[in-house]
Amino acid sequence: MRISARTIVALALGLLVPAGMLATGHASDSVANNKFTVPVVYYKLPNGLRVALSPDHSAPTAAIAVYYRIGFRVEPRDRTGFAHLFEHMMFQGSQNLGKMEMIKLVQQNGGTLNGSTRFDFTNYFEIVPANKLETMLWAEADRMRGLAVTEDNLKNQQGVVGNEVKVNVLNRPYGGFPWLDMPQYANSNWYNAHNFYGDLKDIEAANLPDVQQFFKTYYAPNNAALAVVGDFDPADARKMIDKYFANIPAAAKIKEPDLTEPRQEKEKKASKVDPQAKRPALAIAYHMPERNTPEYYAMGLLDQILLEGDDSLLHQELVQKRGMTGTVEGGINLLGNMYDYNGPMLWTASLFHDSNVKDDDILSAVDSVIEPLRSKAIDQKTLDRALVKLRSDFYDQVGQANGFGRADLLASFALFDDNPQRINSIEAQFRKITPALIQKTAQEYLRPSNRTVLVVEPGTQTPEASKSGN
């Protein structure tokens, strides 16, 4: 599992960016006068599979992405780590493909593939020459229809996952900081706050019936979305999809867990000692507004103002002016982007600093930047600049990796909103945001009592992280 928030190199976006996007004039006028449109064909199979097709003939490739609505925080209490375990199991063979043959099939056909586990989904994707689209659809349907869940495969992957936890978290400096650590301190609901890698005891105790039932429950067409982007004819692709996916039976409807978080009324502070760390680190997180609300879009713009780019307020204050750190990182949804999740989320910022820089001084510097946004509405020029930056980031996402960036958005909007056409209306929602709403959103969601602070200190011991301010 790749734990970086952005691991795919963005491609050139000349054909995707409307003329005038980087104009120095009034950005909101520029936005209003340019229509961004992605072709989308959306339908559902009788078994519930959601299908989004988006032809793009700029390159002779096709991206195929299957998203299952089972992520870190949706897994049952006594099955922690199962979502991630299954990411590995899905490459161990299916009815017609042997162990690791899916990987060989893609690579032998000149393609690339991967899978990842995120907060609200597990995904699998391939990018192949367009003439291999049907082969990949057959292969994805084959493992959706029947995974090779065997005792041998299970034991093997239990060991692989356990080793991954040791390599990526336990034996790595700052392992899991802040993406894995912060949700455990900032959230109150178990589903949002448990260790997403899972309790190794749960993983090691998993037996074959457990794993078979997990697959039957979550890896079903009515719990999935399929997105295809690239050089193909939608009518031809639809015939292929119907041929291979339509006869896969649906599973019983899943009772979704309650993911809601209570309003945080008091600042939380947590600290942990990392014996492998060389320098202290600090992260802050604020609970986000509910997804798809006006305040949610306002927070997307506040993220641009505060954190994104060298002209952002936190970079200017903490790096350029005070020299407290070399960089400030973070954003909305550290495991993806502000569009591909479905539940409570954090806006996070983190930094590494020298030991002579005090945590309280960092927090004071952060407050000196945030409080003016809460006490006074920003000017239109600042809002326009944030809109231009956000549009640039959005187009960057749409243009990533030969169609995968677009497929990620389409699959997410299909899976969570039943509306992949949102890709064409998302900009209009940001254009509705006013300076007054920016201020109102900052007042509610960037208040100190909505904040969690996590400090990592170098040390020689590994005590339990201590909490205060709860």
Give the positions of each predicted feature.
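Histidine-acidic residue clusters that define the catalytic metal-binding segment
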Residues: S28-Y42, D181-A224, E256-E261, E290-N292, ...
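N- or domain-start disorder-to-order transition segments that initiate the globular core
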Residues: N33-A59
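Short, polar/flexible loop-turn hinges at active-site or ligand-entry regions and domain interfaces
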Residues: Q92-Q95, M144-N153, S375-I378
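Positively charged n-region of N-terminal signal peptides that target proteins for export
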Residues: M1-R6
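An aromatic/glycine/proline-enriched structural segment found at the starts
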Residues: S188, P221, A225-E290, P448, ...
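M16 family metallopeptidases and their MPP-like homologs
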Residues: S54, A59-R77, G81-L85, K99-M144, ...
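Boundary at the C-terminal end of the N-terminal hydrophobic targeting segment
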Residues: A23-A27
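Bacterial N-terminal signal peptides
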Residues: V9-G20
